[in-house]
């Protein structure tokens, strides 16, 4: 079972893969032969429980695209000019400017790197809104409950963790 994508590719979900590795290999070989002339890409999500399928896919020219804790997404480029969109090329962080009624600004010291003061904030989790991350990070680091008002600045830093860029969103 496959689905079409905006890049003239087809996507195969892990739950639609056969249980048997030999059947997977034959199905993949047949699929490539059947679509190589009219599709640009083939995407395959492989669940961690089927990780023994990965070497089979790479043998057929699939490369690693992205992953999560329980799956990997592989892609095979069938046409030279095919567009393969990048994924996860930034980490995201949020910082909070918290000013009280006395016009005092809230600063913290990190537990590990505590040689300087900084604004409370941190990593924006996967599928988390900026406003949620802001409130969560300030509360986790200070115990103070805040409400997101607005974004006041965005910073871009490279290199950062994992050889990626970082977007730092500063909020009130």
Residue ranges and their predicted role:
Residues 92-94, 143-172:
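Active-site segment of metal-dependent pyrophosphate-handling enzymes
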Residues 78-119, 146, 150-153:
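N-terminal strand-loop-strand
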């Amino acid at each position: 079972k496959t689905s079409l994508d905006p890049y003239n590719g087809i996507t195969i979900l892990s739950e639609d893969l056969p249980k048997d590795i030999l059947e997977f290999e034959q199905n993949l070989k047949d699929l490539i032969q059947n679509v190589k002339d009219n599709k640009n890409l083939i995407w395959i999500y492989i669940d961690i429980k089927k990780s023994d399928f990965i070497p089979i896919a790479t043998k057929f020219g699939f490369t690693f695209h992205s992953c999560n804790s329980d799956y990997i997404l592989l892609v095979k480029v069938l046409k030279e000019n095919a567009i393969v969109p990048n994924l996860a090329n930034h980490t995201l962080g949020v910082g909070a400017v918290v000013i009280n009624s006395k016009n005092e600004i809230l600063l913290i010291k990190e537990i590990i790197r505590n040689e300087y003061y900084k604004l409370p904030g941190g990593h924006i989790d996967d599928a988390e809104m900026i406003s949620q991350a802001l409130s969560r990070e300030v509360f986790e680091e200070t115990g103070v409950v805040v409400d997101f008002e607005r974004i006041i600045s965005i910073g871009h830093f490279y290199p950062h963790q994992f050889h990626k860029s970082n977007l730092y969103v500063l909020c009130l």
